[in-house]
Regions:
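FAD cofactor-binding and catalytic pocket of flavoenzymes
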Residues: 301-380
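N-terminal glycine-rich phosphate/pyrophosphate-binding loop and immediately adjacent elements
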Residues: 1-126, 284-285, 295-297, 301-304
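Conserved redox-cofactor binding core of oxidoreductases
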Residues: 42, 109-230, 234-238, 299-325
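Glycine-rich loop(s) and the adjacent beta-strand/alpha-helix scaffold that form part
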Residues: 27, 31, 38-43, 223, ...
Length: 380
């Protein structure tokens, strides 16, 4: 069977892949094939914001990775949920819209990466965004990604913000604006009571384009190479190995784990690692698969009565959630429009720290080990 040929082949229909496919196919003369290992984003758990609590701790639309034992964590393993569906992790996460601090981007540029300063990337953030709350120099209107406050406003949110103020963290309505530090309600990627994932924002409106082909359940096996040039991607689908070719570029947007893994499977990486795994070395590139950095969550839980407007395991909580599910199904309103994580704060660990280095996430429920461990009752 002859391989189909496109101008661009994109591996991974996550946040980057969906946006890339949409932008590239704005030109009707450019053809794109987008490969996704997961399935279509049809599940109600994706579209109902509260469905995050069912997907993150399980393998529903989720790779649910475990790390190897970490020396810095006394040998413990870390849990790494990652989306496996159209939209990638934007289809299973808590939908919090949080940009990096200005310092982060300026630091990247200072390290020798032109085009990555805050002033360089801000117009791109604005172009992609439609913010229902803020229309100023820091936010966009009319973009595909809808950003708003959560429709369901639990009274418990106000208690968190009051507690933050008492402890010296003032209210900052827009942490994505001029100043990051402060306490706030999270801005979220919701639209009309549903999750606004990268797939829903960028991909779904453009699926009818004749120059865009989306292939789901396509597990990429390797990048095909001719000499030092990437020419396509071999992938498994339905038990068969297939190949798609690229005239211009092969773009890997399979995530922090998926992209380096595919490079290594293609023979691109540290020669010693590839030889140990029995992979022929095509290009000795020692940095592939190294230097992953991620933040760590420290979870603290406080018990609250079951009548509190929170999520929990109790008769009262179950009855409340059942009613909320019916309300959401009919009207796209109510408790199920909550991302569970509702408020937060950025602050400095010490007065002499230049930028906020600590982040708080306030959750309307007991979240132990990414909700993989359930507890009776209610808490925050």
């Amino acid at each position: 069977m002859n391989a189909q040929t496109f101008d661009y082949v994109i591996v991974g229909a996550g946040s980057a892949g969906c946006a890339l496919a949409a932008r590239l196919t704005e030109d009707p003369n450019v053809t794109v094939c987008l490969l996704e290992a997961g399935g279509p984003d049809k599940s109600v758990l994706i579209h109902a914001p509260a469905g995050v609590v069912a997907m993150v701790p399980t393998r529903i639309n989720n790779y649910a990775y475990e790390t190897v034992p970490q020396p810095g964590l006394n040998g413990r393993k870390g849990y790494q949920p990652r989306g496996k569906t159209l939209g990638g992790s934007s289809s299973i996460n808590a939908m919090l819209y949080v940009r990096g601090n200005r310092w982060d981007y300026d630091h990247w540029a200072a390290l020798g990466n032109p085009g990555w300063s805050y002033d360089d990337v801000l117009p791109l953030f604005k172009r992609s965004e439609h913010n229902e709350q803020f229309a100023d120099d820091f936010h966009g209107q009319g973009g595909p990604l809808n950003v708003t406050y959560q429709a369901h406003q639990s009274p418990v949110n106000d208690l968190f913000l009051q507690a933050a103020a008492v402890n010296g963290i003032p209210l900052n309505p827009d942490y994505n604006g001029a100043e990051q530090a402060g306490a706030f309600q999270y801005q979220v990627t919701h639209k009309n009571g549903e999750r606004c994932s990268a797939a829903k924002a960028f991909l779904t409106p453009n699926l009818s384009r004749p120059n865009l082909k989306v292939v789901t359940h396509a597990v990429s096996a390797k990048v095909t190479l001719e000499g030092r040039r990437a020419t396509g991607v071999a992938y498994h689908q339905g038990g068969a190995l297939q190949t798609v070719r690229a005239r211009r570029e092969v773009i890997l947007s399979a995530g922090a784990f998926g992209s380096p893994q595919l490079l290594q499977l293609s023979g691109i990486g540290a020669a010693a690692d590839l030889q140990k795994a029995g992979v022929p070395v095509m290009h000795d590139l020692p940095g592939v698969g190294k230097n992953l950095q991620d933040h760590i969550d420290y979870v603290q839980t406080w018990r609250v009565p079951s009548h509190t407007d929170t999520f929990g395991v109790s008769l009262r909580g179950s009855a409340r959630l059942t009613g909320a599910m019916l309300e959401w199904k009919k009207q796209r309103t109510g408790m199920v429009t909550s991302s569970i994580a509702t408020c937060g704060a950025f602050f400095r660990s010490a007065p002499d720290v230049a930028v906020p280095d600590l982040q708080l996430v306030f959750v309307l429920g007991i979240v132990d080990d990414h909700a993989r461990k359930l507890h009776l009752g209610h808490g925050i």
